[in-house]
């Protein structure tokens, strides 16, 4: 029997016009948007799904980076945005957003993925404007550049 996340993912694939997307054996589904943004969905449990935006490798050579990430995380939390987290296996910074499955629709899922994407863009640009670059083979600063972006926003 399919989980609520699987049923939603099937409807989402149909809505966006892709043949089929599904969760792997680790209950993850990953895809790129516009060949720039790398998104993973996790079938966490039957109550909610997690949406992850892969921001890039955690730069260990910048002493201000950890403090800036804590500042960004507080700002996102205060404004209802995704949370920043660290994935140790890939040594990567992620944006994570919990997506409740009650009353979930493909449109709502698409909107929340958009929140994560916009938040990724914003985080990347703010860090870039402070001289911090995340190593990310998918997200290219020249594709989303803005010279005056100095403040975070939650993407909503």
Swiss-Prot record:
Stated name of the protein: Tir chaperone
Lineage, uppermost ranks: Bacteria, Pseudomonadati, Pseudomonadota, Gammaproteobacteria, Enterobacterales
SUPFAM superfamilies hit by this protein: Type III secretory system chaperone-like (SSF69635)
Gene Ontology BP terms: protein secretion by the type III secretion system
Alphabetic keyword roster: Chaperone, Cytoplasm, Virulence
Family: Belongs to the CesT/SycH chaperone family.
Function, as annotated: Chaperone for the type III secretion of Tir. Probably stabilizes the protein, prevents inappropriate protein-proteininteractions and aids in secretion.
Domain of life: Bacteria
Cellular component terms per the entry's GO annotation: cytoplasm
Gene coding for it: cesT
Location of this chain's protein in the cell: Cytoplasm
């Amino acid at each position: 029997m399919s989980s609520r996340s699987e049923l939603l993912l099937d409807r989402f694939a149909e809505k966006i016009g892709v043949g089929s997307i599904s969760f792997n054996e680790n209950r993850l589904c990953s895809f790129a948007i516009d060949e720039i943004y790398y998104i993973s969905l996790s079938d966490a449990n039957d109550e909610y799904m997690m949406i992850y935006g892969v921001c890039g490798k955690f730069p260990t050579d910048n002493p201000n980076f950890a403090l800036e990430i804590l500042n960004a995380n507080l700002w996102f939390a205060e404004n209802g945005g995704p949370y920043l987290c660290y994935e140790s296996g890939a040594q990567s910074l992620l944006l994570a957003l919990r997506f409740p499955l009650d009353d979930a629709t493909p449109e709502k899922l698409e909107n929340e993925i958009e929140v994560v994407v916009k938040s990724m863009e914003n985080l990347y640009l703010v860090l870039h404007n402070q001289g911090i670059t995340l190593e990310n083979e998918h997200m290219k600063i020249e594709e989303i550049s803005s010279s005056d972006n100095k403040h975070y926003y939650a993407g909503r």
